[in-house]
């Protein structure tokens, strides 16, 4: 059973401190500096606290994803938001370790229903925030082991993880856990880079290698892998050739320019069928005009509306896990990148199986 690594939280300058009982474990509270709201407990809610307290101003209460209850265990949950504050696998600009906290902060303004799709996730699923995986920032290999162990426990409880990254490295140990539970899975990967590099500088694990390592270990059903938004210069064509040689469908960003992606997603739905599917969304898929706060930006990317079309196009599929990675708050001065990330994670929640619509 997983436990939050609990500590003292402060509401702000000059305020009292709400003390958490110390407990060793794989998870820790998601966003320090905010006091836990009175009455919060481990009991999961069907309804988002955002809608239960519509007059509560932003910045007051629990600093959790959408003000959901913080829970120390995945038991009894259908889905959970989990932060993985890791960026030691980054090759360019760091800062993704701060992504989970910033995304949670921007999520405080989100509502509980999706008027565009009619999805009612909190009336359909039991959802909570499990805090952050207690990674080891000094040892990437150890962090991967900790992530895999944490997600194995979450998945064994029948809970679908929705992950706040962190750099793309984290997808590899998450897929290890997902494949252990579900077998090889299909993948909808949205990002600027294929992340199928082999071993630059003899490093097998970092944010450009997760899907190559996943193929090596048989974690993916390669005939059901789609990569959307790929673009930018490259030192070699090997990653592109490798993806296609494995049977991945690679959709370049140029093939998405100035068009709706609804027809593409209709084809993807046919390709995925009813088998388990994992969604991995790197925020660098979006053009840096919309999402500048990322470690490895590339020009001429997707638009937010296309991102919505991709995620909404997965609604009704057998989604068994999702992640949103590569948000780097130090390069996100306006907060717009984290705001986009929070909204896309909400859309992923709305696309999960068993979510009812009106």
Curated annotation (Swiss-Prot):
Binding site for Mn(2+) 1: 168
Region annotated Disordered, chain positions: 31-56
Extent of Low complexity compositional bias: 46-56
Pfam family, one: Arginase
Catalysed transformations (reactions): 3-guanidinopropanoate + H2O = urea + beta-alanine; 4-guanidinobutanoate + H2O = urea + 4-aminobutanoate; taurocyamine + H2O = urea + taurine; L-arginine + H2O = urea + L-ornithine
Biochemical pathway: Nitrogen metabolism; urea cycle; L-ornithine and urea from L-arginine: step 1/1
Expression across tissues: Detected only in liver.
UniProt keyword list: Acetylation, Arginine metabolism, Hydrolase, Manganese, Metal-binding, Mitochondrion, Transit peptide
EC number: 3.5.3.-, 3.5.3.1, 3.5.3.7, 3.5.3.17
CC terms in the record's Gene Ontology section: mitochondrion
Family, per entry: Belongs to the arginase family. Agmatinase subfamily.
NCBIfam families linked: agmatinase
Function of the molecule: Hydrolyzes linear guanidino acids to form urea and the corresponding amines. Displays specificity for substrates having a negatively charged head group and short chains including taurocyamine, guanidino propanoic and butanoic acids. May protect cells by detoxifying potentially harmful amounts of guanidino acids. Metabolizes L-arginine with low efficiency.
Name of protein: Guanidino acid hydrolase, mitochondrial
Protein's organism: Mus musculus
Lineage of source species: Eukaryota, Metazoa, Chordata, Craniata, Vertebrata
